[in-house]
Amino acid sequence: MDFLNYAFMQRALLAAVLVGITAPAVGIYLVQRRQALMGDGIGHVAMTGVGLGFLLSWSPVWMATAVSVVGAVTMELIRWYGKTRGDIALAMLFYGGMAGGVMFINLAPGGSNANLTSYLFGSLSTVSESDVTAICLLAAFVVVVTLGLRRQLFAVSQDEEFARVTGLPVRALNLLTAITAAVTVTVAMRVVGLLLVSALMVVPVAAAQQLSRSFAATFAIAVAIGVTVTTGGTVTSYYQDVPPGATIVLLTIGAFIALSVLAAPLARRRARALAAAQPAGDPAECAIPATRAAGDEVGV
C-alpha cells in the first residue's frame, strides 16, 4: 500500500473510482439504446476540445467537456433531422474531431502530439488537483442524472414510442442522455483515455448482463465491475509501469470473459429448475403473450 503515500496516486485512485462509477452508469442506457459506439464518437470529438484548451491556454478538461457536449447534441440533431445517413454523419464527427485535436495542439505554443498522448490513453502522473476537482463536479452531475432519472431514462432507452405514449419528453431525455455521455467521456479521459473510454462504458454492462436480466441488478453489478477494474488497473499500472487505460480495458474484458464462463452453467441450472417446476402439459408453455412489455429485454 506504499502507493498511497504519493499524492499523484491518491488523485489517480479517486479519479479511477469516479470513472468506475460513472462510465457503466451511463453505459447501461447506451447499451439499451443500441448506441454502444456513441462513446467512441464523443471521445474523438473531445480531442478537438483538448487541442483547443492547449491552444487557448484554458483547462483541457473543461474545454473538452464543452466541445463534447456540442458534439453529442449535434449527433442527436443529425439523428432527428439530418438527411445524411446516421453512420456517415457519425464517421465525419469521428475523423473531424481527431483531425481538429491534432491540428490545434500543433498550433499551440510549444505544443506537440506528445501532449495529446496522456489524454488519448490515460496517464496517472499528469492528473492534477484541478483535474480532480473538475472530475468530481462532472461525476456528481452524471450520478444525479443517471440515478435521479433512471426510470424515465430506462423507459426511453427501451422503447421510445412507449415512453412517448406515456407522456415522457422523449427528445429532451435523449438530449440529456447524450449530454451525460459527453460529460462521462471527459470524466474518464484522464484515467482511461479518450480512445478507450467507450470500452469502460459498454463492457462492464455486457458483463453484468451475463449474471442478471434485472435493470437494477445489472446497474449495480456493472458499477461494481467498473470500480474494481479501474482501481485494480490503476494500481497495476503503478507497479508494472504500464499504461493505465490499456490495463483497465484488458481487465474489463477479462471480467467479461470470466463472468461469461461462470454464467453458462448457472443459466443451464436455472433452465433445468424452471423446467422441473413447470407441470407437464401446462397450457402456459404454449401461450403466446398478447403484448410486449417495455422491460422484457432487461427487467426493471
Name these PLM-found stretches:
Residues I28-G111, A208-A220, S237-Q240, A264:
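Short loop segments and helix-boundary regions at transmembrane helix junctions
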Residues M1-I21:
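Membrane-interfacial amphipathic/re-entrant helices at transmembrane-helix boundaries
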Residues A12-A15, P60-A66, D87-A91, I135-C136, ...:
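Loop-to-transmembrane alpha-helix initiation sites
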Residues S128-P204:
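Helix-loop-helix "hairpin" substructures at the membrane interface of multi-pass membrane proteins
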Residues Y6-R11, L90-L149, I179:
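Transmembrane helix-bundle core of multi-pass membrane transporters
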